[in-house]
Amino acid sequence: MHEESSQLSKATGLSPYDSLISKYDIDYDSTKIDEVFSVIEKDIIPKYLEIKKISSPYVYKSNISDPKLLDCVKKKLEQLKFDFNRGRIDQSHHPFCGGATNDVRITTRFEDNILESLSALFHETGHGVYEQNRPIQYLYEPLGQSRSLSVHESQSLFFENHIFKSKVYFKTINNIFGNSKDLEKSFLDHYHTVRINPIRVSADEFSYPIHVYIRYKIEKEIFENQIKFDDIKNLWNKNYLDYLSINLTSDTEGILQDIHWYEGIFGYFPTYALGAMIASQIKYNCPLFGIFLENPDAENISNLIVWLNTNIHQKASLYSSDEMLQTISGEVLNSKYYLDHLVDRFVK
């Protein structure tokens, strides 16, 4: 990877690490990322250490059969403007979204923790709706491509975090389960409570950016030649203890938990947190989001998604990420919106 980053750096004129980041996000380099990620170290980490809980969340187990649940979920996805004439949803061992604009394939799995299954499904649907609404006339040209992984992730996280995990929308989900008090308790435990968890993909929304920040800092040190290979594990463990108050006892729950570095994927991790920040900035500046929160009926949900289609999905690569945010919010990427969202959901 050092050789690849060196050659890319020579070709692009970027620093070795920035040349890797640019494979996944052409708009934000490490200087900008340092700027917006400062909110993680200055604000999110101290608040996390103050409000974190050690206990595990309550898990609700559904007694609805998988086929029946899948049928109910499909109706929800139709409300979210996922076009089943140009896509489909199936069950698999792991959730993902793939295919092309006119043939989007989403998969999910229904497991004991039904909330995690539904959360993953809404996440993948966000990716799918973005893909289905890229401009057809420019589909095979650079202009018609999705802007970046950060923007793509912002849409999946908008569907997952700002729609599915909102308390008002959850009530419409709980209707499927007979307005279960147990499911409501599980929902609040999972998505409105901050907990210690060593695994990134299982972390709550508040602590998740800290997991990303740890990886970003280590990657940056690797490609700036500030750390030796043999010291990476110790730095990882130290950061988990300092930032997350987690004393790691195994590499399975530590440095070996992700597939990215095995596959030679460096510079990817920042896009997860950048996507969350973009999604939050969109949320606070979308004129229809407040209407959705007041009444998440089919019409208001449809209007909200059409707004996303018009202002983000159909713009594809016409604008840079900051230009897109300028048109929506009047300013470039600003991490204060992300902090506001986390405080509103987990602290207030």
PLM features: residue spans?
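Active-site metal-coordination segments of metallo-dependent hydrolases
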Residues: 142-153, 207, 266-271
